[in-house]
Amino acid sequence: MGNTIRALVAFIPADRCQNYVVRDLREMPLDKMVDLSGSQLRRFPLHVCSFRELVKLYLSDNHLNSLPPELGQLQNLQILALDFNNFKALPQVVCTLKQLCILYLGNNKLCDLPSELSLLQNLRTLWIEANCLTQLPDVVCELSLLKTLHAGSNALRLLPGQLRRLQELRTIWLSGNRLTDFPTVLLHMPFLEVIDVDWNSIRYFPSLAHLSSLKLVIYDHNPCRNAPKVAKGVRRVGRWAEETPEPDPRKARRYALVREESQELQAPVPLLPPTNS
């Protein structure tokens, strides 16, 4: 259904698109899914709220900045996609949808999340990437069943210690933030399987060898002078990731300094000879 709608509205002027979509949605879809992604919506079509058995609702890539209270009638909703819209605040009605398992909020203009988000105790996956977050909202630490957290491309400088409460968390994506140190709280979360801190400003990585569940760590595009130590079988993606054993930190520091000086002087600098250690 969603693909059909998108194919049709591509040929409809923006000022007529909203009315067309409303008329098209006359019956409850058999698959209990409505996909209005990329439909140029500026307001939510209220008729959708009559589909009380709806399980999946995709509103990605529109021009929405609010949602009506009638959305709260969709109490069977498990997946809600609001990414790539114009939300500056999360509509309170979203926090009343207590069956939500997956919530996509990426690529909006969110600076915080409401405390009422803690009511979504069935939430397993939360995407809040590419917003305006300068710190991870405390309410995220109250989502006890959360398994996947995507908070990349924000302006995070650190993570709250309360994050360790999320003992079901398995994957955390933090790429493209402003981390200058590896978040200490992650060292106390042995249940994590995937850690992504790509594109930050981390200069030193502590050992991650004690994280017994870890399967993948992505640390590329950091000004680091060492690679994180990991247990056998854990995949690393970043500088020195394929070297075994891990490079001598002294040699790594010397290499990094030479490279930095070379870039500053904009002239080639010979590599230092290896030490005998």
Curated annotation (Swiss-Prot):
LRR repeats lie at residues 53-74, 76-97, 99-120, 122-143, 145-167, 168-189, 191-212. It is found in: Nucleus. Coiled coil: none annotated. GO terms for biological process: cardiac muscle cell development. Pfam families: LRR_8. Gene3D superfamilies: Ribonuclease Inhibitor. InterPro entries: Leu-rich_rpt (IPR001611), Leu-rich_rpt_typical-subtyp (IPR003591), LRR_dom_sf (IPR032675), LRR_domain-containing (IPR050216). Keywords: Leucine-rich repeat, Nucleus, Repeat. One of its GO terms (cellular component) is nucleus. Disulfide bonds: none annotated. GO terms for molecular function: actin binding; alpha-actinin binding. May play important roles in cardiac development and/or cardiac function. This is Leucine-rich repeat-containing protein 10. It comes from Homo sapiens (Human).
